[in-house]
Amino acid sequence: VDHGTGVAVVGPGEGEEVPLPGFGAVVKLRSRRDGAEVAIVEHPFAVGTITTPHRHTREDEHSIVLAGEIGFRSDDTEVVLGPGGYITKPRGQMHAMWNAGREPGRIIEVITPGGFENYFRELSELMTAQAGHTGPGLREAPEFAELAAKYGLTYGAPDWLDDIVVRYGLNGPTH
């Protein structure tokens, strides 16, 4: 809530919820609306969830673990952090995050510069529109490639992905 003073207030449990399988997004601070140079997004992680490895060309992501054990891989750096743990994933590095534990996890992401928070909403809308379609999967859809290009995002399948999925007993990435 902006009280006309430039102060943005988001109470506990508030924010724009964006449904994504296994890895949701709750936008806490929207960069353009709130006049901030950053965006803040909370991500819940269901047990067994891993994000699709990806690379940002425009943003750095700073993650703070709030609950559970969350694994991070950014290029050659791999770490599992508990509550209070912090990691920066610089733009240009292929990275993924996963729930490394047996309980739901949650992180806060500070994304700089802001604007990327809109990707989650647009991805959710695309996944909803593609649900039930037969034929090529979401990643083969032209709309998916257009969305990734719009946000300077590339997806990949690095050689470390299968090892992480096996070691932590994860489900495969959802998109």
Predicted regions and their residues:
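A short glycine-rich, His/Asp/Glu-containing loop-to-beta-strand
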Residues: E14-P53, E59-D60
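Short acidic-glycine-tyrosine-enriched beta hairpin
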Residues: V9-G11, R33, H62, D76-M94
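Hydrophobic small-molecule pocket/channel-lining residues, especially in calycin-type beta-barrels
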Residues: T49, T57, E69-I70, E78, ...
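Acidic/histidine-enriched, glycine/proline-rich intrinsically disordered or flexible terminal extensions
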Residues: L126-H175
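Ligand-binding loop in jelly-roll beta-barrel domains
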Residues: R91-E117
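Tight coil/turn sites that cap or link beta-strands
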Residues: A46-G48, P83-G84, G92, R102
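Short, conserved beta-strand element in jelly-roll/cupin
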Residues: I40-A46, R55-S74, V110-P113
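A hydrophobic/aromatic-rich effector-binding and dimerization subdomain
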Residues: G4, V110-P113, E117-T134
